[in-house]
C-alpha cells in the first residue's frame, strides 16, 4: 500500500520469541499467514526478525478498480468458497491467504482474468 511501511499482524506466541502469523499481511510481502517467525523486542513491541518455518500459504492482495463493477464482497465470497482466509482492508482492498490445500492455480487464473478485464488490480504478496 503506498505510503505504508509497516503493519501490525495478529499472531499466536508459541515460545519466548517465536510466533505463528495469524492474519493476512497487507504490506509485508515476505510473510504469509501460518508462517512461524522469530521476533525481537523494539520499543516495547515485537518486530519480525526472520521466518523460521514457512507455513505453506501464499498471499494475494486485490483492489477492485470499478466501484460500479465487481463488488469486493463477491470477490471475498468466491475466495472463501475456494477455502481462502480473506481480510478486508482500506478502500475495499482484500488480502487473501491461499492455503496449501486450496486450488492456487485456479484461484490465480480467476483473479488474473478479473485483472485482464480491468475489474481489479492484483498485487501478489509472498508466494509459496
Regions found by a protein language model. Give the residues of each.
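Short beta-strand/loop turn elements enriched in aromatics
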Residues: 1-14
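Short, structured beta-strand/loop micro-motifs enriched in basic residues and often containing a Trp
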Residues: 13-23
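Short, Lys/Arg- and Gly-enriched loop/turn segments at beta-strand edges
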Residues: 42-54
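Short glycine-/aliphatic-rich beta-strand segments at the starts of folded cytosolic domains
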Residues: 52-66, 94
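Helix-rich terminal scaffold detector
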Residues: 67-128
Amino acid at each position: 500500500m503506498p505510503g505504508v511501511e509497516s503493519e501490525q499482524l495478529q499472531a499466536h506466541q508459541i515460545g519466548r520469541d517465536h510466533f505463528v502469523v495469524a492474519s493476512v499481511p497487507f504490506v509485508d510481502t515476505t510473510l504469509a499467514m501460518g508462517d512461524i517467525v522469530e521476533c525481537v523486542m523494539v520499543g516495547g513491541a515485537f518486530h519480525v526478525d526472520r521466518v523460521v518455518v514457512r507455513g505453506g500459504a501464499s498471499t494475494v492482495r486485490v483492489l477492485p478498480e470499478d466501484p460500479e463493477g465487481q463488488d469486493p464482497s463477491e470477490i471475498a465470497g468466491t475466495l472463501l468458497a475456494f477455502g481462502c482466509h480473506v481480510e478486508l482492508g482500506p478502500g475495499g482492498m482484500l488480502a487473501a491467504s491461499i492455503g496449501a490445500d486450496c486450488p492456487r492455480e485456479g484461484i490465480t487464473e480467476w483473479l488474473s482474468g478479473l485483472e485482464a478485464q480491468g475489474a481489479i488490480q492484483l498485487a501478489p504478496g509472498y508466494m509459496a
